[in-house]
């Protein structure tokens, strides 16, 4: 069936700020769908509050609304844009839940908007636990024994029947939020109460425990003609009990027999048909009892999911794009496979390699949180690696996570290692180390329930490590031997660690033996047809499938796995660089290891290498492709850390040079440079040892801001107010950070106002692109503070001085590209805190606020264009206020106090735009899911809040200063840091923990009071800007 012509305008809902359980994969999915629908001639309207995404760029959708994802705001967009259809399956759980609300409250019916991609009934059957169980019973597919309960009393009755351990799954929540596995009756009561509260429909499913069973996922697509294809099978390395988003996963499934696979396949076909998903993709999860082969279905997601992104990258099959086209009427056999150009999308992908995904965690950001993994997702990012065997794929994935293969585990006692065999982020490394020590596969399997096949594969890697020492001197290894060793996935660094040589010597010996990798192509068909899409991975075999072209080419290094401090903002910058360089006539080569992102889409760069971002893997590609330039300044700290070694090995780094990066990041040379330029700085010193740190602290006086050099996201940064606090801090840092880092000690400017300044420089001219005023005072990490552009409270004279000083600094450093400078203003003086000669996390926000693609400009500067040629010679002065607010993941980390400090903790951001700064702030707060009340009670705790109280009272809120019994207020402002902050957060009450935040919150509520807030697209804002200028 050809595409529908009765639809003209299609509304797509994004997923909002990046959060745990809902990350960059939805930017990738949404971007793919937007491009596909636009190409088909549809008018596309997007609502998404997250400015750090590619999908919210003004040239993707026809109308882009950076507005809160709430029924009220989406209704306003629908009223204004009058879409014919709503496609809700590309924005994760947020979009699906919102679409269901708009359907239930009559908005869709009122404006004649059709749900496409999945109908309301299919969403209900797939998402509602009771409806799903009933549907499975009807088709004879077994589910875990369980019951949906709607009250604690009902739960207690059913628990008596089913016993412990028991699994609690709230309905309609994201990433397992509010759920868990209860091993004790006390835990059962606590988790069930929380789950009933967290579920938007106040119901939870109680299920028998299937801990230790094997877990599989099938990625399935179905069209209107009832053609169903299985895109891939995915097997969880970790057994049941760990959320699939936190599990190491492998595609295709490795331990299923053909009969078992066909059984899961048949079940999947029956399930997708019964649920009624007939225009898109679904992810179906199964558990298999290894004792008797009993199969039960765990759940399905009737939408594009995190696993869909992984399956797309693993196979080369663009699930989100195909799902969007099926939603507008196409059938699978009508859609061509982009990669082969001869097979239709109805052909199931076949792969002749193994893909491994390893999650990335951030428990170090939340000290005191237990790191046990369960049914609630806790990982903040992930890596993917491709190899010809599981062993090669696993070792490549491990080095992609940027964690040492052995590291601290070699120093641990065997008893301590055994203590790490429960589900936790360090279990894989503990398993490897125990197998090294002869623990044996049966003992490790008994303790972990990890399938013996996986453990025996790891045992083979460990045996090979020992064998390396019996192969004779490494200086005499011949090509064949090198190839056999490298085919197991060993890096040069790991080989060097085993044989006792530096990595560079191992590399030189390997190259002398002519043992270099070949590159294979991801083609969806196991090389049966020619592939036209250049998507590659390395291995050590004979045939190389990748022939470099003669065109001038530039390599762009991606940012690797998302983590707190290095998120989707850096992917945004690298993708913009790709587009800018393609426009300038260069062939672009992307190297990255993150399966969630737009940068690793096969049709973003001219060539994609899905490889670890390590010195060895990057240099192999550079030597293979011979580019004219390598760009390291856009992917965050990961590529920056490689810059110096790459340059020394002959990689042609373009843009800002490694020497400049070093000068800005090395505190002593940076301090000297600022002194030379006469830029005020807080008094500071650099200590090389703990003893020296204590001596310098006594000299500088307290309070001090302390941190190790070369970190991103304020890792291990703290404010210390006494010698005791400093000593505790030093003990922790030297235990946690590799090597012996130098420690920076800076006088802490208590109560100072911070500024973030993004600047472009071509070496001859520097232009400030935007100055952001932080809402929170100094002491809160810049990545966790809300900020407003342009500044609201500072004098024009001071801002002019900051602008001039920033531009002088950029020229003095010799920056060629982007520079981010942070300032602190106290008593009318602007002190420079730090300068980062790279893309910062504010680049997407500033680009959208000032209507200039800064990362594109940086890429053009890197290949020799000047700011004059680009047409960016003056600081833009937008006639609007833009506010960036952050999303904090405290709810996922039980018991952690939700107080902001110098270590970054946020995972994502939202943006609000208005002509009034406080209304922009109000929109940004709603966009970040902080629902500021316009009526009700505000509880204020702490000194210095009289002005806040007066503002809130004038806005009509009742202000109290003591809690009334157990009753929680509608808004909590608590600058004392009391435990009530955590309680309020868990109950969904908006919380504010800083005085500055309290002032902005009160003014925002007052500004919004009695106003009808309209909606305006980003394109309309930018046209308004263009007209004004």
Swiss-Prot record:
Mg(2+) 4 binds at residues 834, 836. PROSITE patterns: ATP_GRASP, CPSASE_1, CPSASE_2, MGS. It comes from the Bacteria. Mn(2+) 3 binds at residues 822, 834. Mg(2+) 2 binds at residues 299, 301. It catalyses: hydrogencarbonate + L-glutamine + 2 ATP + H2O = carbamoyl phosphate + L-glutamate + 2 ADP + phosphate + 2 H(+). Mn(2+) 2 binds at residues 299, 301. Residues 930-1029 are annotated as: Allosteric domain. Keywords: Amino-acid biosynthesis, Arginine biosynthesis, ATP-binding, Ligase, Magnesium, Manganese, Metal-binding, Nucleotide-binding, Pyrimidine biosynthesis, Repeat. ATP 1 binds at residues 129, 169, 175-176, 208, 210, 215, 241-243, 285, 299. One of its GO terms (molecular function) is metal ion binding. ATP 2 binds at residues 707, 747, 749, 754, 779-782, 822, 834. Residues 930-1028 form the MGS-like domain. Residues 547-929 are annotated as: Carbamoyl phosphate synthetic domain. Mg(2+) 1 binds at residues 285, 299. The large subunit is composed of 2 ATP-grasp domains that are involved in binding the 2 ATP molecules needed for carbamoyl phosphate synthesis. The N-terminal ATP-grasp domain (referred to as the carboxyphosphate synthetic component) catalyzes the ATP-dependent phosphorylation of hydrogencarbonate to carboxyphosphate and the subsequent nucleophilic attack by ammonia to form a carbamate intermediate. Belongs to the CarB family. Large subunit of the glutamine-dependent carbamoyl phosphate synthetase (CPSase). CPSase catalyzes the formation of carbamoyl phosphate from the ammonia moiety of glutamine, carbonate, and phosphate donated by ATP, constituting the first step of 2 biosynthetic pathways, one leading to arginine and/or urea and the other to pyrimidine nucleotides. This is Carbamoyl phosphate synthase large chain.
């Amino acid at each position: 069936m050809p595409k529908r012509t009765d639809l003209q305008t299609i509304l797509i809902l994004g997923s909002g700020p990046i959060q745990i359980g809902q990350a960059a994969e939805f930017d990738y999915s949404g971007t793919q769908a937007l491009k596909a629908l636009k190409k088909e001639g549809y008018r596309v309207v997007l609502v998404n509050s997250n400015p750090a995404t590619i999908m919210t760029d003004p040239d993707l959708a026809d109308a882009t609304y950076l507005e809160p994802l709430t029924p009220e705001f989406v209704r306003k967009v629908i009223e204004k844009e009058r879409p014919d259809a709503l496609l809700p399956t590309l924005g994760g759980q947020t979009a699906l839940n919102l679409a269901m609300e708009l359907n239930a409250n009559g908005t869709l019916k009122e404006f004649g908007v059709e749900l496409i991609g999945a109908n309301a009934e299919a969403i209900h059957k797939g998402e509602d636990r009771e409806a799903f169980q009933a549907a499975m019973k009807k088709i004879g597919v077994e589910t875990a024994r369980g019951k949906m309960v709607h009250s604690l009393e009902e739960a207690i009755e059913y628990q008596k029947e089913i016993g412990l351990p028991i699994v609690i799954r709230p309905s309609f929540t994201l990433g397992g939020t509010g759920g868990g596995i209860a091993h004790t009756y006390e835990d059962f009561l606590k988790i069930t109460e929380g789950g009933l509260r967290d579920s938007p429909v106040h119901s939870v499913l109680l299920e028998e425990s299937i801990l230790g069973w094997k877990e599989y996922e099938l990625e399935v697509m179905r069209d209107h003609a009832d053609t169903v294809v299985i895109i891939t099978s995915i097997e969880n390395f970790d057994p049941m009990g760990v959320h699939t988003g936190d599990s190491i996963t492998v595609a295709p499934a490795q331990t299923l027999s053909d009969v078992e696979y066909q059984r899961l396949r048949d079940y999947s076909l029956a399930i997708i048909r019964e649920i009624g998903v007939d225009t898109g993709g679904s992810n179906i999860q199964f558990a298999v009892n290894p004792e008797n082969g009993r199969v039960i279905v765990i759940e399905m997601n009737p939408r594009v999911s995190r696993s869909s992104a992984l399956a797309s990258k693993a196979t080369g099959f663009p699930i989100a794009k195909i799902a969007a086209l099926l939603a507008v009427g196409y059938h699978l056999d009508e859609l061509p496979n982009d990669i082969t150009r001869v097979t239709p999308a109805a052909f199931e992908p076949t792969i002749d390699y193994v893909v491994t995904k390893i999650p990335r965690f951030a428990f170090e950001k939340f000290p005191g949180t237990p790191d046990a993994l369960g049914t609630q997702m806790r990982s903040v990012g992930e890596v993917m690696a491709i190899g010809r065997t599981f062993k090669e794929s696993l070792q490549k994935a491990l080095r992609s996570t940027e964690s040492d293969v052995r590291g601290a585990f070699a120093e641990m006692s065997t008893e301590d290692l055994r203590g790490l065999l429960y589900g936790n982020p360090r279990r894989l490394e503990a398993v490897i180390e125990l197998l090294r020590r002869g623990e044996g596969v049966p003992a490790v399997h008994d303790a972990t329930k990890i399938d013996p096949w996986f453990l025996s594969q790891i045992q083979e890697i460990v045996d090979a490590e020992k064998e390396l020492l019996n192969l004779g001197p490494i200086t005499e290894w011949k090509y064949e031997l090198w190839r056999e060793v490298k085919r197991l996935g060993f890096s040069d660094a790991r080989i060097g660690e085993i044989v006792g040589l530096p990595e560079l010597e191992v590399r030189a010996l390997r190259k002398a033996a002519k043992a270099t990798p070949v590159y294979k192509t991801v083609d969806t068909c196991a090389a049966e047809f020619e592939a036209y899409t250049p998507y590659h991975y390395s291995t050590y075999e004979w045939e190389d499938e990748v022939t470099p072209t003669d065109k001038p080419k530039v390599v762009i290094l991606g940012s690797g796995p998302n983590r707190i401090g290095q998120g989707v903002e850096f992917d945004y910058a690298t993708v913009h660089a790709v587009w800018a360089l393609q426009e300038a006539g260069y062939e672009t080569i992307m190297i990255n290891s993150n399966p969630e992102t737009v940068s690793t889409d096969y049709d973003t760069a001219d060539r994609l290498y899905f490889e670890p971002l390590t010195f060895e893997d990057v240099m192999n590609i550079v030597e293979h492709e011979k580019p004219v330039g390598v760009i390291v300044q856009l992917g965050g700290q990961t590529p920056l850390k490689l810059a110096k070694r790459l340059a020394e090995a002959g990689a042609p780094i373009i843009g800002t040079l490694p020497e400049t990066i070093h000068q800005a990041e090395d505190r002593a040379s940076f301090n000297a440079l600022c002194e030379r330029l006469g830029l005020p700085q807080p008094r500071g010193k650099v200590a090389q040892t703990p003893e020296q740190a204590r001596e310098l602290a006594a000299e500088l006086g307290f309070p001090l801001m302390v941190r190790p050099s070369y970190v991103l996201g304020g890792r291990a940064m703290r404010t210390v107010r006494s010698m005791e606090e400093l000593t505790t801090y030093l003990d922790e840092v030297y235990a946690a950070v590799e090597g012996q880092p130098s420690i920076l000690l800076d006088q802490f400017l208590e109560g100072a106002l911070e500024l973030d300044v993004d600047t472009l420089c071509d070496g001859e001219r520097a232009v400030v692109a935007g100055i952001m005023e932080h809402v929170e005072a100094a002491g809160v990490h810049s990545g966790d503070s809300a900020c407003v552009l342009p500044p609201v409270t500072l004098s024009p004279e001071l801002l002019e001085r900051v602008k001039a000083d920033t531009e002088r600094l950029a020229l003095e450093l010799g920056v060629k590209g982007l520079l981010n400078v942070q300032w602190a203003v106290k008593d009318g003086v602007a002190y420079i805190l730090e300068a980062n000669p790279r893309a910062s996390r504010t680049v997407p926000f500033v680009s959208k606020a000032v209507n200039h693609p800064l990362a594109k400009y940086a890429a053009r500067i890197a290949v020799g264009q000047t700011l004059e040629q680009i047409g960016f010679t003056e600081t833009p002065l937008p006639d609007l206020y833009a506010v960036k607010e952050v999303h904090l993941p405290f709810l996922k980390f039980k018991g952690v106090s939700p107080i902001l400090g110098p270590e970054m903790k946020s995972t994502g951001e939202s943006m609000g735009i208005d002509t009034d700064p406080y209304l922009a702030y109000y929109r940004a707060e709603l966009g970040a899911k902080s629902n500021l009340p316009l009526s009700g009670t505000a509880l204020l705790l702490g000194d210095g809040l009289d002005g806040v109280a007066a503002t809130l009272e004038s806005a009509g809120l009742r202000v109290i200063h003591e809690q009334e019994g157990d009753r929680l207020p509608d808004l909590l402002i608590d600058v004392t840091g009391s435990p009530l902050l955590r309680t309020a957060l868990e109950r969904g009450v908006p919380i504010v923990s800083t005085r500055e935040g309290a002032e902005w919150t009160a003014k925002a509520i007052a500004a919004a009071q009695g106003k009808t807030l309209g909606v305006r697209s980003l394109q309309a804002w930018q046209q308004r800007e263009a007209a004004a200028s």
